[in-house]
Amino acid sequence: MKVSYHGHSVVKIETNGKVILIDPFLTGNPKTDLKAEDVNVDAILLSHGHGDHVGDTVELAKKNNAVVVAPFELATFLSWQGVNTHPMHIGGSHEFDFGKVKFTQAFHGSSYIDEENKTITYTGMPAGILFTAEEKTLYHAGDTALFSDMKLIGELNNIDVAFLPIGDNFTMGPEDAVLAAKWVQAKTVVPMHYNTFPVIEQDPYQFVEKLQNCTGKVLEAGESITL
């Protein structure tokens, strides 16, 4: 399984001849190396409904006839826009032809904000994502605060790599993320959701230096690891 990072919370997985994107915020993302028009994808996994995570989902899904796996309310909202969706909910898992997906708890919000009409549409509960293929497991925490049940996620799953937000303000900051890394017990931890906007500026190298009992890895946009 090849896993690459593409800025903010965008993660690409290549496995079993399939390409999966998590939270494909490409257009308007100053930290990504990807352009939506150049991306080919078989499946899209969404953690929640905020614009910096849903991103280019509708365009990518329609262009590639890709399935969008998302929390139930968000999946329903996107299906009304003509997207092929597979709704799930926290605690549920499903075996797809590209791998197994399970949604975990996350402490955050989830909504679609229409700035022009000044409306906010509820899109369900936010989630973290466990993805398993080729006997390897990736944990994408989504946007979240630190929460004690991360210990349970670590106890129940043999996590090879975890992507954890460190930006603070909207999610946990570096200090809490260090504790999260300890609790989820991943072999490798990669920071995400930082430096996209001034309010979430952080030094990822300082973060990985503080990690214990795991390998910390800073990935620049386009860099990858192989599990």
UniProtKB/Swiss-Prot annotation:
InterPro entries assigned: Metallo-B-lactamas, RibonucZ/Hydroxyglut_hydro, UPF0173, UPF0173_UPF0282_UlaG_hydrolase
Keyword vocabulary terms for this entry: Hydrolase
GO molecular function: hydrolase activity
Keyword hit for Hydrolase: yes
Top-level taxon: Bacteria
Pfam families, A to Z: Lactamase_B_2
Family: Belongs to the UPF0173 family.
Name under which the protein is recorded: UPF0173 metal-dependent hydrolase BCE33L4354
Organism encoding this protein: Bacillus cereus (strain ZK / E33L)
